[in-house]
Amino acid sequence: MEKDIKIYIDSTRYEVEASLFSGESDEDELLQIIENAAAPEPEKMEIKTLGRLVSDSFKTEISYDETEITGMQGSSTVIFFDKKDIGTVTMMRTGQVSTALVFEKGQRHHCVYSTPYMPFEVCVHTLDIKNHLDGEGTLDIDYIVEIRGARAERTKFSMRISE
């Protein structure tokens, strides 16, 4: 099945005092650091855009073009997952900004985030993921991302799709 869709994304980002690269923090320790942090006001972003849904019996893929709002204009994003493992979601960006981020609850993944200026090593730790894209048309990911040498951020990403 292939069809055009409407995509609604809500994203909230918080700065946190944690290092994912050290590999020393377990999930309980990370959650305690996050909960006890006195973070400044979160940064919120809402995006409404058009995209494409491609789904077969093996995988589901949602694609859309990034906008000026995200600061990644000129890039395209594809979010996909294997239907046998809906708890692992991959987000690939190509264009001005490119990366492949893997989200899997309780897991830490290292990735490269390429910008027009230079590539950065990124570590992503997924706290929670609720993937209902094939049913209710929603995807919620709660994760921490850290660019090596920079402050970590917790992001709560929520996507809703409709026809």
Locate the predicted segments by residue.
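Mixed-charge, glycine-accented linear interaction segment located at domain edges/termini
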Residues: 130-163
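Generic short beta-strand segments
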Residues: 8-17, 65-67, 125, 142-144
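Short, well-structured hydrophobic secondary-structure segments
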Residues: 38-96
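A short, structured loop/turn motif at beta-sheet edges
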Residues: 53-57, 82-85, 114-117, 134, ...
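Short, hydrophobic/aromatic-rich segments at coil-to-beta transitions
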Residues: 1-6, 56-63, 88-89, 108, ...
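A short, surface-exposed beta-strand/turn
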Residues: 26-29, 81-84, 156-163
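Acidic, glycine-rich flexible loop segments
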Residues: 92-137
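Charge-rich, low-complexity N-terminal segments
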Residues: 1-53
